Amino acid sequence: MKVAAIQMVSSAQVEVNLRSAGRLLEAAAADGAELAVLPEYFCLLGHRDTDKLQVQEAFGDGPIQQFLADTARRLHIWIVGGTLPVSSDVPDSADAASRSRVLNTSLVFSPGGQCVARYDKMHLFRFDNGREQYDESRALLPGAQPVTFELPSRDGHRWTVGMSVCYDLRFPELYRRYSAAGADLLLVPSAFTYTTGQAHWELLLRARAVENLAFVAAPAQGGLHENGRQTWGHSMLVDPWGRIAAEQAEGEGVVLAELDIARLREARLQLPALEHRVL
């Protein structure tokens, strides 16, 4: 199955970002991609964390979700909409802080344009090294459930796909849960900072692939954004042996590779580590 990890340098204008995403998805489909995965915050990287609140959508309704559905249907490919801000279902009685935050949601659309899976980012990033400060909990609520979906590909294999987002990558127990569910492909749409990405991005992606003997698709934001934030980029596809099948360092682009299920089966046969676990 050909998979595309879409790298973007998203701006603070949703319409501009959707046009860029549409162009990149068209390029991926033209190159034969069956699944295309957009990065975290593909639709908006605003000037303030709270800018997300202004473009939030109710699940199942809104122009960003309509764009994803229409594009999947038009190109007849599977599309994972990195993340978009989705309104939470917290009751009116909840505290004001909860009611003023949204979920960072990854949605999967089938080639028919149906939304077939939803994952809300579970782990919220916080970082402070004295020069850079980030705290996603100011504008986001955490998700609560791991999510997998089934993707019947043209190669005849029915892929089990585990969903995650960015900071989730640092929590291997999530991916162990996916491994136990039979996942052979792990998705990690991200917007790693330059600082943390330079230190840990490739290391963590390859580790998740090797320890779970699974493919990893990791689209990323990669460049200097309008808000002054520098993201690390290096979108990549990693095979179950930890080899990088394709990668792009920075700037927008389509990172494409053929994921061969026979390669995964061979790796698991040669090194049946998943069967040797004792804990």
Model-predicted regions and their roles:
Residues 79-89, 126-134, 216-220:
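Short Pro/Gly-enriched beta-strand edge/turn motifs at strand-loop
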Residues 57, 90-181, 194-203, 270-273:
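Active-site catalytic loop in hydrolytic enzyme cores
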Residues 262-279:
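A short C-terminal boundary segment appended to hydrolase-like catalytic domains
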Residues 1-12, 37, 105, 118, ...:
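Active-site-proximal beta-strand elements of phosphoester/diester hydrolases
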